[in-house]
Amino acid sequence: MKKIIVLFLFLGLSLISCDAEFLDPTKPTEGDVFSSRSGLIGAANGLQSKWSIGRQSPVYTIITGSGFTTNELRLLNAGNVDEAELLTGGVSVSSKNAVINNLWSQSLVIYAEAQKVLDNIGVISVPVEKASIFVHASIYKAMATGTLVQFFEKVPLQTTKNAGFSSRADVIAATIATLKSTEIYLGTAN
């Protein structure tokens, strides 16, 4: 009996003592991505993919959210609960509605990633590439904030913990400022 207890005690201790973190050797770190030319170009191109591909993308959620809330779309499959909630509207829309949550979260992810690209634009040394990437990232940043302000009363303009929420007027002004910042690059961007 003692041997069995000692064996289980040893097995229990060995399970909780393991502190190995296995990293994917093929996945670059954030520092690697934003400190190299190819990484920054890849991150900028990834904005388009994040924006447009999949049911969680802002393209899908914008069309679905606005279409069902304004009765421009019709629900053919009542099994799509999130879309059915939007169609019914009012208190039937739960706080766990995937369309609304994806619109919020994915737009903020795109906003944050675009800002990271803009913050590290100095990595690019070729003026045409720099201009193109700056304009590309700025457009996606502006689309993210512009989308959020269409659907929500207040939106955070920082992507930090406990970021404050800004009014629609402030968000629209920031969106316009983002787009105006591209004017100096428009002559050289591809």
Predicted segments with their positions:
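Positively charged n-region of N-terminal signal peptides that target proteins for export
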Residues: 1-4, 20
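Short, solvent-exposed loop/turn elements at domain surfaces
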Residues: 53-61, 72-75, 83, 90
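Conserved, well-structured interaction surfaces
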Residues: 41, 81-152, 162-169, 180-190
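Membrane-proximal, proline-rich intrinsically disordered regions
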Residues: 18-67
